[in-house]
């Protein structure tokens, strides 16, 4: 009929009015939270132009438990297990920062033996983390053998955790004033024997991955971060060292007795995913050397207390059985908790993923007034849009893997 305005039934609003052709639009997809390469509860809305990433919008908070608020209503000692549940891949490294913050506010000096045990188990945590990061990252780009090898070594390290404190994962082993208990007699021998075998595993992973043509094609020149960019985004750990900046708190701001240990700081040149992979491989070798040195120093150290006895720590069991004052102190410590002098402090450790810090504000009571947790993964994840823009969709899992994020600490 004359005058009819005939509409194309297939037109969904994307038809060009002048030419009648279908205009090409970007489309959005959801990456995660149920995705094997998301490394936790990561949901990203990806805007794609074909297979090119135009925008990556990370949605966080799916694992938010309100940790910082919960810490304000519990005693300092009751708060310690919360730290294990942040970066649950290497739990003791987070406990370390919490204990350092309390010790600095109270002016506590811990026994040397406890300090050496802390260094030993912090490096075990670093290897636990890097084995997980490197091998699952390799799996994300198609190499299925490394996780099978890496998790075998991780299992042995988790048994060392269990033999020291009774727990494989949520240890609560580091305590304000030292560590909960001394190591069993044969444990140092077994750790030393493991350290002699471990470089062979790293060599095998090296042979399998480092010069593998497909592996290099997936990582080289992907997710490049310059030194200036790393500083602008607030990167720490491997993310900043992979870009050429030799910043490591164990060397630049030594804590515990790290200044007594001989180790190198692996540094990359190109700031891409491949350099970050190489840094983690080299760091595992250096951590193994630190563990061997710690074992030798612990052997040379006379057997003694691993807790600085005082207001922060319980009395010895033998004293409690014969002294009423000690028994009362023990009861008060585990019911009311110890008081921390009013003040504020920032204590940071070089965690496996970067600088993990605790900003603690004390008001003189037995509970913190405020505890701010500085999670390295949070700073790294904020740049995922900037890092992945212009890359292929298949490059996104490789970038996420070398960011090394875990959602226990990102969401807190």
UniProtKB/Swiss-Prot annotation:
Organism annotation: Paracoccus denitrificans
Pfam (any one): Complex1_49kDa
Name of the featured protein: NADH-quinone oxidoreductase subunit 4
Keyword field contains Transport: yes
GO cellular component, one term: plasma membrane
Similarity-based family: Belongs to the complex I 49 kDa subunit family.
Gene field: nqo4
Gene3D superfamilies: Cytochrome-c3 Hydrogenase, chain B (1.10.645.10)
Membrane topology type: Peripheral membrane protein
Protein function: NDH-1 shuttles electrons from NADH, via FMN and iron-sulfur (Fe-S) centers, to quinones in the respiratory chain. The immediate electron acceptor for the enzyme in this species is believed to be ubiquinone. Couples the redox reaction to proton translocation (for every two electrons transferred, four hydrogen ions are translocated across the cytoplasmic membrane), and thus conserves the redox energy in a proton gradient.
Keyword vocabulary terms for this entry: Cell inner membrane, Cell membrane, Membrane, NAD, Quinone, Translocase, Transport, Ubiquinone
């Amino acid at each position: 009929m004359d005058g009819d305005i005939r509409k194309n039934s297939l037109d969904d609003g994307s038809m060009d009015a002048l030419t009648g052709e279908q205009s090409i639009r970007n489309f959005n997809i959801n990456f995660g939270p149920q995705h094997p390469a998301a490394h936790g509860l990561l949901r990203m809305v990806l805007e794609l132009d074909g297979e090119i990433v135009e925008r990556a919008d990370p949605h966080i908070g799916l694992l938010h438990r309100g940790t910082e608020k919960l810490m304000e209503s519990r005693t300092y000692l009751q708060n310690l297990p919360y730290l294990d549940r942040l970066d649950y891949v290497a739990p003791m490294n987070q406990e370390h920062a919490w204990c350092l913050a309390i010790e600095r506010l109270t002016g506590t000096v811990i026994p040397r033996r406890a300090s050496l045990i802390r260094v030993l188990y912090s490096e075990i945590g670093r290897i636990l983390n890097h084995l997980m990061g490197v091998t699952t990252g390799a799996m994300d780009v198609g190499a299925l053998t490394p996780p099978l090898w890496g998790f075998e070594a991780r299992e042995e390290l988790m048994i060392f955790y269990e033999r020291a404190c009774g727990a494989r994962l949520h240890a609560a082993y580091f305590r304000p004033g030292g560590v909960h208990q001394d190591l069993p007699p044969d444990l140092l021998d077994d750790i030393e024997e493991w350290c002699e075998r471990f470089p062979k595993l790293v060599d095998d992973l090296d042979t399998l991955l480092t010069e593998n043509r497909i592996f290099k094609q997936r990582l080289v020149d992907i997710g490049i971060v310059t030194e200036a960019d790393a500083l602008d985004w607030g990167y720490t750990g491997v993310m900043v060292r992979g870009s050429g900046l030799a910043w490591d708190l164990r060397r630049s701001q030594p804590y515990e007795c790290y200044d007594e240990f001989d180790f190198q700081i692996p540094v990359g040149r190109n700031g891409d995913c491949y350099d970050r992979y190489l840094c983690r491989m080299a760091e595992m070798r250096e951590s193994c050397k630190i563990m061997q040195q710690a074992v030798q120093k612990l052997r040379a150290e006379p057997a003694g207390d691993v807790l600085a006895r005082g207001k922060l720590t319980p009395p010895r069991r033998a004293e409690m059985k014969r002294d009423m004052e000690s028994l009362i102190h023990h009861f008060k410590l585990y019911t009311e908790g110890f008081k921390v002098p009013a003040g504020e402090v920032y204590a940071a450790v070089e965690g496996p993923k970067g600088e993990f810090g605790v900003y603690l504000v004390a008001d003189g009571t037995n509970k913190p007034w405020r505890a701010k947790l500085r999670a390295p993964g949070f700073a790294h994840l904020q740049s995922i849009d900037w890092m992945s823009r212009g890359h292929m969709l298949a490059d996104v899992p490789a970038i996420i893997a070398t960011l090394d994020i875990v959602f226990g600490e990102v969401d807190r």
